[in-house]
A protein has these predicted regions:
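Charged catalytic and DNA/RNA-contacting regions of genome-maintenance
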Residues: 1-236
Length: 236
């Protein structure tokens, strides 16, 4: 879809479009004085990388998941950036022989605890049943992309060094205390690379990644807040 709007009303229209959670908007601006006018790519705005054009001030997380499996048991590296504040989170979860879907359940909970508007899903094993994972995480209800970028350790270290301004004798991954969570470091590298490709300004305010402390939360599933009449439903 191509559209043009008066410059004075750009923010209003763009906020409404992004709020639909369906579209990635490419902003083409022009510079110069007619007839010597040139057009250039200014910004790429997607649901997860939007922080300038918002209808409310709620958190807006873009999330990256790296999914692996061992003998049918799922392992997930999770990372997320709240583009409104620059806060960065990560965790790595492994399933068990008793519950092979445990890791998927955990990241599903993470995405419900932290308002998630866009997701990049990467698969470490080509034999993973991708449809099973996407359906289990109910990603058809969100904006998501299948990622194919698999950054090497050397790339991750250099990327983190530049983004987080790390000056240390340790590797960047060690400095961030993430050497024991390789799925999470790769997930975070994929996420940062994606964000830079959309709007590099977001990276300038990025804080050091924090391990997600799930012990601070209780997850209320199955629309529990609505069922308990804590919040109103749209049809009430």
């Amino acid at each position: 879809i191509m559209a043009g709007v008066p410059a004075i009303s750009l923010e209003k229209h763009l906020a409404r479009i992004i709020a639909e959670q369906k579209y990635t908007v490419v902003l083409i601006k022009q510079k110069g004085i007619p007839p010597n006018v040139t057009r250039y790519l200014d910004t790429v705005v997607s649901p997860g990388t939007n922080f300038d054009f918002v209808l409310d001030q709620d958190e807006n997380n873009i999330t990256s998941l790296l999914i692996d499996q061992i003998r049918g048991i799922y392992l997930v590296g999770y990372s997320a950036i709240d583009v409104t504040t620059g806060k960065c989170y990560y965790n790595e979860v492994h399933g068990t022989s008793e519950d092979k879907f445990f890791a998927l359940d955990e990241v599903f909970n993470y995405m419900n605890m932290h308002k998630t508007n866009e997701i990049i899903v990467s698969f470490a094993d080509k034999n993973i049943n991708q449809k099973e994972v996407l359906d289990y995480l109910e990603l058809s209800l969100k904006t998501f992309h299948i990622g194919h970028f698999r950054p090497k350790i050397s790339y991750q270290n250099e990327l983190f060094k530049n983004v987080f301004n790390i000056q240390s004798l340790l590797t960047s991954i060690e400095h961030l205390d993430m050497e024991r969570v390789p799925l999470s470091t790769e997930s975070l590298a994929v996420l940062i690379d994606f964000v830079i490709g959309h709007d590099s300004n977001i990276i300038q305010k990025l804080s050091h990644p924090q391990k997600l402390d799930v012990s601070r939360y209780i997850y209320l599933g199955n629309n529990a807040l609505e069922q308990l009449n804590v919040i109103e439903t749209t049809h009430n």
